[in-house]
Structures are given as C-alpha cells and as structure tokens.
Amino acid sequence: MHKQNKTCKIQQCVLKYIHTILGVVIMQGAIFDVDGTILDSMTAWVDITNEFFTEHGINISKEETLSYQSMSFEESLIGIHNAYLPNMAIPEMFDEFSRRASEKYSKNLPAKPYVCEYIRTLYNDGVKIAAATSGFPELVYSAFKRLKIYDMFSVYAFSGEVGCSKSSPDIYLLAAKRLGLKPEDCTVYEDIVTGIKSAKSAGFKTVAVEDATNTQDKDRLIQYSDRYITGWDELLSNI
C-alpha cells in the first residue's frame, strides 16, 4: 500500500510538471457548498421551513421562503424571530429546525446524481477538498458519513465561524486558508448567486450548479460564474 501511494504521488508530480510546461492551469483545491450543490436538500429545507411556519400559524410567500437560502442559518433564525416570532427564543427555534432536519440528513437525504463520483475522482487525483456551508455541522457530517465522502474532505468551514452570510467571501477564504491554498488555486462550487458573486470577487474560479430552487436565477448564475452546469455528469465527462 505504501509503495502504491508513493507511486501515485510521483505520477501526480510528473503530471503537474508536464501541465506546467504546457501552460495548463491545474486545480489544486475544490471548495464545495453543501445544500443544493452536493446534497439534493434545498427542496427539503423549503418543506421544513414551510412546515415550521404552518405549525406556528404564519403565512409566508414562496419567494420569502427562498430568500432565506442565501443567509447563514443564524441570520435566518434572527430574521424569522424578528419578523414573526419575537416571543419564541432563538435557541428553541434552533432546536426545532435541527430536530426536523436531523432524520432526513442521517437517513435518506440523497446526494445529487454523480456528485460523489466527481468528488471521489478529485480526491484520487490529489485535489484538496473543502466544504463551505451555512448548514449545521452535525447534519453535514452525518450525511457525508452515510454517503461515504466524509473522509475525502480535508477541511470544513461553516458560516457560523465567520459570522456572516455568503454575500461576503469570508467563508470561502477560510476554507482556502485551511487548505493552505490561495483563492486563485481553488474552484468554488455553489448554487446561489450571492455565493458565486462573492467567491468570484475574491479571486476564486467558480462553477454554478443548477438546482430545483434556483432556476429563476439561471441567467445571473451563468453571468457571474466561470461555468454553469445542469448536472455533475458534465464535469465527469471532462476528466
């Protein structure tokens, strides 16, 4: 096994040298959003949010429900608390949302088709991989372990650590720092416009991922990203 790993590293070094001579840019780091990018979960979160509002007697439009997806979870809870439930403690809201989501993430929430294969291919090619997400750490970890991709991620970065939403590139910069890489050496994979724009502004290459909840933003995702994909098989076919 040790000999195989050594041989693989030598092959990777030779390949990188050849690419450098030819002027080919090699991706050293891949930074993935989780919900809506790796996990087919955005519709589930819309359902969870709608169920929460219904049980508390709150009427809310689809557009407003979707607006929360660009926020960190902490920002979403504060917004809901201030606008609709000032008498409900935020920790209580946190526990309720977490309880609703926990079973889905740990048992049956699916990954998007071919994304695990793509991540595995990058991992085998020696690319450093990070997750940058607004989600709960426990939910992300449980889903990734179930999907057998947890150990392929070198680092994890959460919006709660940087204290702001993805309209700021801080979470992507944190992920790159933990990978030991510069932004220009990393590609960010995202499904929301604010994330694509902020990552691009910080010097990252960007790939926008189509999702059932972002079709209204397709034109802007195409405009601001380096590439737009409708499915992960598109990237697998290029490897």
Placement of each model-derived feature along the sequence:
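N-terminal helical cap/lid subdomain that shapes the substrate entry/recognition surface
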Residues: 28-125, 150
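Conserved SAM-binding loop
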Residues: 38, 111, 129-132, 164, ...
